[in-house]
Amino acid sequence: MKVAVLGAAGGIGQALALLLKTQLPSGSELSLYDIAPVTPGVAVDLSHIPTAVKIKGYSGEDAKPALAGADIVLISAGVARKPGMDRSDLFNVNAGIVRNLVEQIAVTCPKACIGIITNPVNTTVAIAAEVLKKAGVYDKNKLFGVTTLDIIRSNTFVAELKGKQPQDINVPVIGGHSGVTILPLLSQVPGISFSEQEVADLTKRIQNAGTEVVEAKAGGGSATLSMGQAAARFGLSLVRALQGESGVVECAYVESDGKHARFFAQPVLLGKDGVVERKDIGTLSAFEQNALSSMLDTLKQDIELGETFIKN
């Protein structure tokens, strides 16, 4: 099993690479790529960790050597948020980066599962899909927007509020991966009930958690370590599913049946070929139904922005 991390010299990429080096199954290969010249050194640094995971780093304009033979590609390359920016401010820079990298994936490892971490995810996933489609290699079951950070934040915040163990909580989060498009389904957390005020406050905190980190870092970065952990969790779930483990379910932003929007975050069952089943989002509370209806225009605009970027 070969996993490639693109953007491996950045804050998310280094955290992700560290977690994969320590947690990938024995015999796996880990390939690190970044435009920054430090990348081969990041790989050498990680190579000293005593796990049976082969690691190599590549830098420069050409990502193809890093991508050769990859089963999974995780893309975290791009610029990070600064205070006062929202995820859409990142679009102008990150759209071109994602397009360029996905074009190289399309020719080098077109059958790989691709996890997009680079924000704005609502838009960058649509960009990736259009690039792959143009190249004639698009498989909607193998392209994912990694929204796992929304899930781990939800689990953490609910556990804090209710005095529970975070690993025992599983909050499904649907919609998209920015602002109002992030919708935690708190009504579906088994064995825990919330007041209306708690639901409103938690939902808002989960939606604004990225900004909470950006402001707390006072201009020194965005959520890199928690995002690295979230991306590693998603990547390792994909590895397990590709290797034949059954019953692996994660929430992810995928091309859906189009009922809500072309791309939609929802629980998906993973298997040997990527998504095996897009699971039903279940019955929503009145609060959730209202939040879903009012976010769809924003989500659709985000998606259209990505589609148009490639088509024009």
Swiss-Prot record:
The active site is at residue 177. SUPFAM superfamilies: LDH C-terminal domain-like, NAD(P)-binding Rossmann-fold domains. Its EC number is 1.1.1.37. InterPro entries: L-lactate/malate_DH (IPR001557), Lactate/malate_DH_C (IPR022383), Lactate/malate_DH_N (IPR001236), Lactate_DH/Glyco_Ohase_4_C (IPR015955), Malate_DH_AS (IPR001252), Malate_DH_type1 (IPR010097), Malate_DH_type1_bac (IPR023958), NAD(P)-bd_dom_sf (IPR036291). GO terms for biological process: malate metabolic process; tricarboxylic acid cycle. Pfam families: Ldh_1_C (PF02866), Ldh_1_N (PF00056). NAD(+) binds at residues 7-13, 34, 94, 117-119, 227. Substrate binds at residues 81, 87, 119, 153. It is an enzyme of class 1 (oxidoreductase). It catalyses: (S)-malate + NAD(+) = oxaloacetate + NADH + H(+). GO terms for cellular component: cytoplasm. Keywords: NAD, Oxidoreductase, Tricarboxylic acid cycle. One of its GO terms (molecular function) is L-malate dehydrogenase (NAD+) activity. Disulfide bonds: none annotated. Catalyzes the reversible oxidation of malate to oxaloacetate. Belongs to the LDH/MDH superfamily. MDH type 1 family. Homodimer. This is Malate dehydrogenase. It comes from Pectobacterium carotovorum subsp. carotovorum (strain PC1). The lineage of its organism: Bacteria, Pseudomonadati, Pseudomonadota, Gammaproteobacteria, Enterobacterales.
